[in-house]
């Protein structure tokens, strides 16, 4: 059985390989702008900015694009005033959906989201409706083929402050408290591991979906991810691995 994390990884790989890579850049630039505006333009003293810049570098964003986005955030260059807004709701099958958006027009974003929720048989809900289902956590991912000694990896991660390690899927996931993410990441990198790190929201419980509901959920999540204003989408669905792959193949085909 797999859930939101597997879907997100598949979606990210597809976007990185095709013409939608520009959407990744658009979202990352917005994140850099807002992070620099809120915490300053120094990545050494601004953890959120450092994380955004590291993700941009991992996607091979040109250095000048990153620097320009930082300057827009600090006010050195003129830029759009993006606001961070959280939206909550339910997808088909009672699946909880938690959306983080960066927008220059909250009314437009709310209207577009309401349209998508209605189109795919979900419902946009009030603030607090589903946020209690999710926990904010740091997540470090390592490709399984990069790990020669799983026990050694576990020992390093635990000693550095990791809370949990999920090694049943690829990539391997190391879960931390958000404030410990940088420390655990640094220790793993010092040990020679290539890692990707992010702060995310993990569901405390899941809802299994199958058949038409499963297809509608994945189609809906894809549509949400394709919105320029939407930065991150989190959900608590669970479905059979094979069924997910078959549905995604049809949707992307």
From Swiss-Prot:
- Localization in the cell: Cytoplasm
Fetch the Pfam families from UniProt: TACO1_YebC_N (PF20772), Transcrip_reg (PF01709)
Where primarily located?
cytoplasm
The entry's protein name is Probable transcriptional regulatory protein TRQ2_0469
Q: Which GO terms describe its molecular function?
A: DNA binding
State whether keyword DNA-binding applies: yes
Cited InterPro entries: Integrase-like_N, TACO1_YebC-like_2nd/3rd_dom, TACO1_YebC_N, Transcrip_reg_TACO1-like, Transcrip_reg_TACO1-like_dom3, YebC-like
NCBIfam families from the UniProt entry:
PRK00110.1 (NF001030), PRK12378.1 (NF009044), YebC/PmpR family DNA-binding transcriptional regulator (TIGR01033)
